[in-house]
Amino acid sequence: MKNRIIIPLDLDHINALNIAKTLDPKICRLKVGNQLFTSSGPQIITDLKEMGFEIFLDLKFHDIPNTVYEAVRSAADLGVWMVNVHASGGIQMLEASRRALEGYDQPPLLIGVTVLTSPVSYTHLTLPTSRSV
């Protein structure tokens, strides 16, 4: 199946693996975000890939160009299917992200996040600037 759905695994390691066991890698891909990757590290990618899944590593990298370059290379070295960066990091960071994938036979897809969405999508307009957060 070419257009597989992407299932977010916003869970802890054990529950993520238990959910993955109920899914078919032929019909879906899995998203590993900040919560799961921070708590489980690269092992979660290894475990899910061993089950046959393609992984979208959703960490929205955003830092100085060299740091993002290295982070994107590390993601590619893990063998993820797709990785993202936050586009607000600027053109140099975006170009570094693209360069990081040069030389890979099958590099992950690289996508840019332009705006974060949430149920309250206008929170960035109401941030308190006159007091400590």
Per-segment meaning from a language model:
Residues M1-L57, F61-I91, L125:
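Conserved N-terminal beta1-alpha1 strand-loop-helix module at the mouth
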Residues I14, S118-V120:
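Short, acidic Gly/Pro/Ser/Thr-rich loop/turn segments
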Residues F53, Q106-P108:
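A short helix->loop->beta-strand "cap" motif at the edges of active sites that frequently abuts
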Residues V68, E95-A96, S121-Y122:
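Short, well-ordered secondary-structure micro-motifs
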Residues I91-Q106:
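Short amphipathic alpha-helices and their capping/turn segments at secondary-structure boundaries
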Residues L109-L116:
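Non-cysteine beta-strand/loop elements that form the S-adenosyl-L-methionine
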Residues T123-T129:
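Conserved small/polar residues in nucleotide/adenosyl-binding loops
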